[in-house]
Structure formats: C-alpha cells, structure tokens
Swiss-Prot record:
Full protein name: FMN-dependent NADH:quinone oxidoreductase
Keyword set, alphabetical order: Flavoprotein, FMN, NAD, Oxidoreductase
Family that this chain belongs to: Belongs to the azoreductase type 1 family.
Subunit (UniProt): Homodimer.
Residues holding FMN: 9, 15-17, 94-97
Species for this entry: Gluconobacter oxydans (strain 621H)
Amino acid sequence: MKLLHIDSSILGDSSASRHVSAAAVAQFRKKDPSVEVISLDLASDPLPHLDVEALSWLGKDLTPDVSGRPELIAGANALKDFKAADIVVIGVPMYNLSIPSQLKAWIDRIMVAGQTFRYTSGGGIEGLAKGKKVVLAVARGGLYGEGSPAASFEHQLSYLKSVFAMIGITDLTVIEAEGLATNGGADRARILSDAEQKASAL
C-alpha cells in the first residue's frame, strides 16, 4: 500500500495542519507498518506555477530533449505519485479564505484530462481516480463552518471537496482544527489536541 503525505503550510513545526496530518499518517503506519509513505512538502519544495510549456506536457511522457528539466520532472512526478497512491493525506491551512498557492500548483499538476478525469460525450465529467482514500487535515484561525457568520467566505474545504469529487474520489475524510485564533488563541491547544485525536482514530 502506498500513502502520499502532502503538507502545504509555511509555518513549519508551529503549523496546526502539519501536526494533524502527521497524526493521520502515524495512525495509518500503526495500522499497516508495511505502508510505503511518499512525503511532499510544498512549502519547502514548491512546484512552480503552471506556464504554457508545463501545461503542454501535462500527462505526457517527457521526451529526451526536456527530460532533464527539473520543473517538468517535478510536475510529472506529482501526477505519477498521486496516481500510484492508495491513500492521500493532505495538510491544508486556510490562507486568505482559500488554500495555499503551493497546494493549488500541485492540484494543477494532478487534475489532468485523460489522466484523472475525462469529459464525456454528453458534456459531463467522469472521475478516473476512483478507489483512493483522501484525508484532509484542515486548519483555520477563524470559524467558517456551516451556520457561522463567515461561512460564505469559506473557499478552502468547499473547493477541495469539488476538486476531489470531480476526479472520482468518494472516500474523503475531513479533520478540522477550526477557530485556532479565536479568543486570542486561548483555545488553540484544546482544538489542536481534539483534531489530533480524531486523526489518531482513523
């Protein structure tokens, strides 16, 4: 079994999403010590954002004349590792109502027509990445959940749910550490501990 572990927070060891994603990965390792973990830190080793050339190579085998280009290799490997993974664990902080741009750059490498989804003759979309389990370790400073005053501003989790639904993922687990900065951060430790416990119970 292969597990792809992705972190996207720029905050290093002080990142809530990193703590929760690490707890989830530790639990999967505990349940199956033979699991092969591939780690991708999009903060310390970011993928470049798409340009015209990178777009033209999405989902294609690199030819010898470009096979030495690090940015193209990184994009090809991102898609390869995602397709090979049985489980994907992603640490996702909220930045300015949405996801980090580093994570968006990764998504742009794995959402590839003909590889992870296809357009049907009737104008619909069929996901081709079925059968994977995805765990989202979501961290937010404020309260953006359903029923909260700021719910309409939330474009983090709702966006990711759409992304993974489009490519055929139906086994999606969300672990939220929300409200980390409310009350001056007084509840941060408790909120983070609760989220880590949920991750450890996967």
